[in-house]
Amino acid sequence: MKIKDFNIECDNLKIEENEFSKGSFAKVYKGSYYGNPVCVKVIKKDTLIDKESWVFLKREIGILKNLLNQGHKNIIRFIGIGEKDSLLFLVTELINGGDLGNILLDHKFHIPWSLRVKIAKDIAEGMEYLHSKQIMHRDLKSNNLLLGRNWTIKICDFGFAKEITIQNPLSMTICGTDEFMSPEVILGIQYSYSADIYSFGMVLLELITRSKLDERLPQNNFDIDYEELQNKIPSECPREFLELSMKCCNYDPNDRPSFTDIVQTLDQLAIKLVKETPDGPYPSTPIVVSNPHFDDQSINDWCMLSLIPDDCLENLNEFAEIENNINNNNNNNNNNNNKNNINNNNNNNNNNNNNNNNNNNCKVICENCASPQSTSSVNSSFSNSSLGSNGSNSSGTSTSSGGKKRSQKRKSWKCLIN
């Protein structure tokens, strides 16, 4: 089976050695095309062993090409596809901020409510654009939302996306990621655009709670456990924000708002928050500078190592000098303490803190790149989502063609906002 229009000249495509993401059929690398930084998804043809795999791949390429004609600020930009020997190369723009899911789980990053609303609006505007082009994403989740400069969200991964036609307005394929899938998708019921809206509602709940979503196992017919959720909602959460998330997560698809309605609601909420609780300028995208000697990294490590906005790159040399001065001072203090055998508790505490800082592999730099502060291991902060049943694969997504009966035990979401 052939894929036409291979418009990437592979001789001018350079790929770094270490992968930073791995899925069922592909590995993702950082690379360059004619010297410009790009993201490269490398697919071995022999992994596409069945017709369904080719269908999903060709559909993803077709959708990305169609979106390229006009483009949208909240959709990943497609550059092209190439072929060489047994490999296919899917090339997109490189987004250095990592994915939203990992950022939300790391609580050392302060994300004010006005910024959370802005993030939600970015996602909604991108999804509104997709739906206006008759495209369902079908795998909307926080890990498929990349963080660009100035906290701009880019929707990515269109492997399960599908164009909706008048002749075929509904779908029955069970695909996506368990924690974000709507009940009608999991149960094998016909669904349409409203399934994406449910997934968006689950992303909003992650924005609100800044915690992992619990797997919706057989209880509740895959509806939300509202009693458990209530314990995770911060008291300062804007009522309208929580109410919107609950409307998007309505069990009945007909009761969910459209993305056009969602954008309007978030616009109004953003204006209200600025008037009532101005947060000032949004914080800069966090920067993490790695130890220069690192081996092959997982996707979560790499995303953290590459959180470097353009406007802060010029300060990295200054930071390195500051860090060297700190290390030299620490070594001098330690030598003086050893020579004089001073038994001062305060000095010992300071030395211990300094030694801990020296032993860290990473440093988080504040907004002006001038005051490094230590952080714990990247791996301890960012862990992969646990896989659900229902045929989940290594990328946390699942696909199936049949539904399963589930016991039903539902509670009203209104208990959360009354």
Curated annotation (Swiss-Prot):
The active site is at D139 (proton acceptor). Residues 14-271 form the Protein kinase domain. The lineage of its organism: Eukaryota, Amoebozoa, Evosea, Eumycetozoa, Dictyostelia. This is Probable serine/threonine-protein kinase DDB_G0280461. Its EC number is 2.7.11.1. SUPFAM superfamilies: Protein kinase-like (PK-like). It comes from Dictyostelium discoideum. GO terms for cellular component: cytoplasm. The keyword Cytoplasm does not apply. One of its GO terms (molecular function) is protein kinase activity. Keywords: ATP-binding, Kinase, Nucleotide-binding, Serine/threonine-protein kinase, Transferase. Belongs to the protein kinase superfamily. TKL Ser/Thr protein kinase family. ATP binds at F20, S21, K22, G23, S24, F25, A26, K27, V28, K41. Residues 327-356, 377-418 are annotated as: Disordered. The keyword Transmembrane helix does not apply. Residues 377-402 have a biased composition (Low complexity). It comes from the Eukaryota.
